[in-house]
């Protein structure tokens, strides 16, 4: 529904008024007209006549208020507006504030009539009004475009729409051919008839969307975006406002707890000397390697061999197992131990035999043969899960290097 807005602009330079043909005519006033208009200031008969016209118009508007309230006819307000404009055109140039006060009061009354008319519009009772059913079906058509596109549904643009276009073209042709013979009343009747036909055809066209009532068929985001684009709602700032009622939390006085922990015995750090550093270093590297070799020689003998994992793994300490692997790598590097593969391809270690030849030439040949022998470098990595799996696989219950 389009709202009716009543407004008019009055200037001393120009005056716009409708003529019988519907066209607007502008009357420009020159300086000579302004001089001649000063003669109206002293015309009491004209002022009295215009004043009487304003009073009669106010009486008519008072009577028309009941009609507007009952029918919602906006034409009453428009007729009164035209009457006020004609009265105002008669007093242009007259300096009489009393007449201007009556004119302003009349404009206020006309605005109230227009407001009452818009408020009391009764839809569906008159074909000149907007039909509520057509509004709903038009909204459905707007929101069903995506549904029609996804389901390959075509709008039923029946012959009524085409007939309306043809009828409109024919009416225009007849109007151009018979303008000489037609009267203004006939033209007005033809326009009303064409408008009635167009309204009926549009109503029939929109009926095809009336049976769509499922919520999921409509694109509600589309109508929301349209409303957000063309609506005049003021932006709100509710999201910037905090809670309106903030209760002040009462302050709770707490008593600090005394520390009753007993003070332990005072301990000072041990002083580090050069002798203690040397002794610690001897225990952690070379001595541990020597102890590891002595235990292997004592338990296996010169000819025995043992699985590498059974030799290094300590089932009670993961860190100790890593240390044993570290010591074993030193023994292999220095040529004290020899690592081989058993029948299953698992690594085994044994004590490397010394050269037993008495002849110096034979010793040198054996030494060169051992140097030329193929050597493999292995990077062995052991983590906690692997360590547990090896203990379970070989059923290791006690460390070999205890």
Swiss-Prot record:
Q: Is DNA damage among this UniProt entry's keywords?
A: yes
For the region Disordered, give the residue spans. Answer: 1-45, 166-195
Q: Where is the composition biased (Basic and acidic residues)?
A: 22-43, 179-191
Cellular localization per UniProt? Nucleus
> Where does the protein principally reside?
nucleus
- Which UniProt key words apply to this protein? DNA damage, DNA recombination, DNA repair, Nucleus
Concerning Pfam families, the annotation shows:
Nse4-Nse3_bdg (PF15412), Nse4_C (PF08743)
Give the family per the record. Belongs to the NSE4 family.
> What does the protein in this record do?
Acts in a DNA repair pathway for removal of UV-induced DNA damage that is distinct from classical nucleotide excision repair and in repair of ionizing radiation damage. Functions in homologous recombination repair of DNA double strand breaks and in recovery of stalled replication forks.
Name of this protein: Non-structural maintenance of chromosome element 4
Originating species: Saccharomyces cerevisiae (strain ATCC 204508 / S288c)
Which gene underlies this protein?
A: NSE4
